[in-house]
């Protein structure tokens, strides 16, 4: 890796227990009600509250045009800020991408310094942060992500583990919780073919499920049916005129969620092997 990483100073109070952030609070709440993910592996634990599906949240890559930005703001979409991009939020809610995909497209190695700078500036108030991964790296990517998970131990922000071609639910199962979720990457065929599996696993572990590069109404519908919590895409970023139909598809998909959506199922209804 290029350069050494030092956690930002703002993390210190959370690590020492002097401050309580989202991750610490949600895990305390989840533990009390038995929905911290441990019931997945320990059947004797009862979940003492029911899971209720929430509207799927949409993020779009940062845009440089005011028209596109205002269209996103009006539709209550959020920004997905890349660590390799411009580190501005434009006053909108946002999540932080690790920049690995951008670096991959540019033929570059993962930029540790850029990621560290982004976490320092924006990490504390992000909805979530994608842990660094290796594009098309398979299990080597997971090992890389786990090193970063250890480095960011104590962070108050929700973290997402990137899963991709070749990974199985049991590879990440025991890592997941309301504070550590899933980012579904990989190529399009693999992503669409395994989305329901990750939705079932997310329900069993009660963790956040995000799917990347969702740029059509059909894929939005598929994501909603799989119990996905959030999506991102670039279509709305590039063209303000494409945002209304995508947003309409998002709202329609939420309104049409059926009983097979895993996020609304009781734990006993979801198979441990995550096959639907």
Task: Label each residue range with its predicted role.
Residues 97, 161, 223:
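Conserved, mostly hydrophobic/aromatic
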Residues 110, 171-174, 215-230:
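Catalytic cores of alpha/beta
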Residues 140-147, 167-177, 194-198:
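Distinct, well-ordered alpha-helical segments
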Residues 51-54, 153-160, 201-212:
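Short beta-strand/loop segments at the ligand-binding rim of alpha/beta enzyme cores
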């Amino acid at each position: 890796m290029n350069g050494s990483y030092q956690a930002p100073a703002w993390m210190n109070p959370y690590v020492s227990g002097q401050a309580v952030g989202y991750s610490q609070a949600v895990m305390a709440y989840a533990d009390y009600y038995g929905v911290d993910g441990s019931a997945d592996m320990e059947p004797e634990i009862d979940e003492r509250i029911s899971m209720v599906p929430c509207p799927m949240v949409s993020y779009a890559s940062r845009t440089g045009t005011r028209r596109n930005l205002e269209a996103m703001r009006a539709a209550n979409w959020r920004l997905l800020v890349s660590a390799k991009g411009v580190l501005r939020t434009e006053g909108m809610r946002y999540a932080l991408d690790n920049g690995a995909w951008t670096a991959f497209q540019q033929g570059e190695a993962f930029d540790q310094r850029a990621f560290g700078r982004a976490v320092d500036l924006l990490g504390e108030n992000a909805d979530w942060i994608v842990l660094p991964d290796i594009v098309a790296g398979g299990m080597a990517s997971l090992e890389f992500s786990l090193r970063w998970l250890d480095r960011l131990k104590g962070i108050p922000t929700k973290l997402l583990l990137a899963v991709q071609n070749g990974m199985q639910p049991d590879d990440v199962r025991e890592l997941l919780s309301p504070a550590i979720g899933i980012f579904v990457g990989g190529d399009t065929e693999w992503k669409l073919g395994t989305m329901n599996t990750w939705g079932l696993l997310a329900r069993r572990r009660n963790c956040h499920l995000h799917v990347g590069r969702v740029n059509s109404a059909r894929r939005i519908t598929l994501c909603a049916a799989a119990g996905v919590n959030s999506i991102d895409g670039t279509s709305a970023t590039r063209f303000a005129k494409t945002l209304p139909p995508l947003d309409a598809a998002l709202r329609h998909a939420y309104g049409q969620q059926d009983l097979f959506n895993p996020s609304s199922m009781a734990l006993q209804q979801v198979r441990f092997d995550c096959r639907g």
